[in-house]
């Protein structure tokens, strides 16, 4: 049995000029034990102008969070440049390369997925989701954005995570939703 702490399911959306990111609170030890129900995996950083969320190994995610925050400071809040620099360092550093986590970062203009393989991806539709319940949240969010455009970014983010929590055993209903 794998004995690491994992944190899962983050959803982010740009919709009708607003942005929101939601994450659940569950931290799982290995594949069988829920160790925490109220982890905070979505945060406002860089003077409240950037939202960041993580999924994956908790310790690894915190390491990446710190590196990303440092890059934001270094590049005066330039989200894209900071994400690219973190991805380059993550991929090329022998120690960082072993980190098992993913980040979603966003500001009012950009929404980016940052992965350990050096990927920095900006979605065409303004929606991203990661973690074990990510595909469920992504499907729910896309359907809501398309079929219920009157909903706010926050409402879509919350509903997408609630749907993922109803389906995925590694996602709970203790949600944090942040907006810009």
Swiss-Prot record:
Mind listing the UniProt keywords for this protein, alphabetically? Allosteric enzyme, Cytoplasm, Hydrolase, Metal-binding, Protease, Sodium, Threonine protease
UniProt catalytic activity: ATP-dependent cleavage of peptide bonds with broad specificity
**Catalytic residues (UniProt):** 8
Q: Name one GO biological process term.
A: proteolysis involved in protein catabolic process
| Molecular function terms, GO-annotated | metal ion binding; threonine-type endopeptidase activity
Q: Which Pfam families match?
A: Proteasome
Function statement = Protease subunit of a proteasome-like degradation complex believed to be a general protein degrading machinery.
Instruction: Supply the name of the protein.
Output: ATP-dependent protease subunit HslV
Query: What is the organism field in this record?
Result: Halalkalibacterium halodurans (strain ATCC BAA-125 / DSM 18197 / FERM 7344 / JCM 9153 / C-125)
- Tell me the organism's taxonomic lineage: Bacteria, Bacillati, Bacillota, Bacilli, Bacillales
């Amino acid at each position: 049995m794998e004995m690491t702490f994992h944190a899962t399911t983050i959803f982010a959306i740009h919709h009708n000029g607003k942005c929101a990111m939601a994450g659940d609170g569950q931290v799982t030890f290995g594949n069988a034990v829920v160790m925490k129900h109220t982890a905070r995996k979505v945060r406002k950083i860089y003077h409240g102008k950037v939202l960041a969320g993580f999924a994956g190994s908790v310790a690894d995610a915190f390491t990446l969070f710190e590196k990303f925050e440092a890059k934001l400071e270094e590049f005066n809040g330039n989200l894209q440049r900071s994400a690219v620099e973190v991805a380059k360092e993550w991929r090329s550093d022998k120690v960082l390369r072993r980190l098992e986590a993913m980040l979603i970062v966003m500001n009012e203009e950009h929404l980016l997925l940052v992965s350990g393989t050096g990927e920095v991806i900006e979605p065409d539709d303004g929606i991203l989701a990661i973690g074990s319940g990510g595909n469920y949240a992504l499907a729910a969010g896309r359907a809501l954005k398309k079929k219920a455009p009157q909903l706010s970014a926050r409402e879509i983010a919350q509903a997408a995570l609630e749907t993922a929590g109803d389906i995925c055993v590694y996602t709970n209903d203790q949600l944090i939703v942040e907006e810009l």
